Amino acid sequence: MKLTCVVIVAVLLLTACQLITADDSRGTQKHRALGSTTELSLSTRCKSPGSSCSPTSYNCCRSCNPYTKRCYG
């Protein structure tokens, strides 16, 4: 009888912890590394593909073509 009560209480506590954790994690990403790179790319201003660029200024989102001096993505 005591063991049954302990198991029921443990299951209820674990279920409550799962529900609380699920509510807190809404809108966040599962992997922290992906979240940090996403935040970095959203917070930096970069030029869209086809915009003029300089290969040394690193202002394109991906890369700058040194021959055409245009961003490509």
Curated annotation (Swiss-Prot):
Note: Has a very low activity on Cav2.1 (it displaces [125I]MVIIC with an IC(50)=1.05 uM).
One GO CC term, this protein: host cell presynaptic membrane
Segment forming the signal sequence: 1-22
Transmembrane segments: none
Compartments, record wording: Secreted
Molecular function per GO: calcium channel regulator activity; ion channel inhibitor activity; toxin activity
Propeptide: 23-45
Claim: Nucleotidyltransferase is one of the keywords in the record: no
Domain comment in the entry: The presence of a 'disulfide through disulfide knot' structurally defines this protein as a knottin. The cysteine framework is VI/VII (C-C-CC-C-C).
One Pfam family cited in the UniProt record for this chain: Conotoxin
Protein's recorded name: Omega-conotoxin GVIA
Keyword list, A-Z: Amidation, Calcium channel impairing toxin, Disulfide bond, Hydroxylation, Ion channel impairing toxin, Knottin, Neurotoxin, Presynaptic neurotoxin, Secreted, Signal, Toxin, Voltage-gated calcium channel impairing toxin
4-hydroxyproline: modified positions: P49, P55, P66
Cysteine pairs bridged by disulfides in the record: C46-C61, C53-C64, C60-C71
Annotated consequence of substituting Y58A: Strong decrease in activity
Record PTM Tyrosine amide, positions in chain: Y72
Tissue distribution of the protein: Expressed by the venom duct.
Top-level taxonomic group: Eukaryota
Main location: secreted
The organism's taxonomic lineage, starting at the top: Eukaryota, Metazoa, Spiralia, Lophotrochozoa, Mollusca
Stated family: Belongs to the conotoxin O1 superfamily.
The UniProt record lists the keyword Manganese: no
